[in-house]
Amino acid sequence: MKMKSLFVAMITFFSAAPFAHWQPIGNAEYTWGPFHVYTIGLFSETGTYQENERPLMLSFKYEKPIEGKNFAITLIKEIETLKLNDGDTQSWLKEMQATFPDFSPNDILNYIALPDRGYFVLNDTVLEHDFDAKFNQAFIGIWLAPNSTFVKLQPQLLGKTKSNHEATEFYLKPEIESFDEQDSTPELPPNYLLDSQKKSQG
């Protein structure tokens, strides 16, 4: 039982590690008609938001299955409504479509924006491809720009009004197989020798 407790503690620690320095600002539900599509959360190192602040993290917890390629198309359409005129949206579309897998309910997608670049993390896996600072600004602007189509979500996302969701919903919950207390024999690697075996072979 002690070994099991230690194993659970280690997994919990490493699952929470990416959030060790992130403080929640706020979160909000995105719905389409009657459907709850995802919950989006905003995080910073201070727990407050200031325009152009870096690092910054946007987190999405999916409630519905979403095709990655279609999600990328939706994001580019939203970026185009911002009329930024300083980014290559077609290149961004290709890069996101090559980066995103399909998303399942309870998947957590994080976008981490640094001063000069940004990247996506799906659950506990860093997705291949870095995006530039212009993409950072455009991606964050989808939800936080004054002319965003998601302006109604901003009061909750910026922590000005209370959300129905807790920040802990964006933490990964490790899947632990049930432990059979009747089976107290640990499984060892195929070539692992116990001390008694080593002595007999010596």
From Swiss-Prot:
Region described as Disordered: 179-202
Name of one Pfam family that matches: Chalcone_3
Domain of life: Bacteria
Name the UniProt record assigns to this protein: Uncharacterized protein HI_1399
Species: Haemophilus influenzae (strain ATCC 51907 / DSM 11121 / KW20 / Rd)
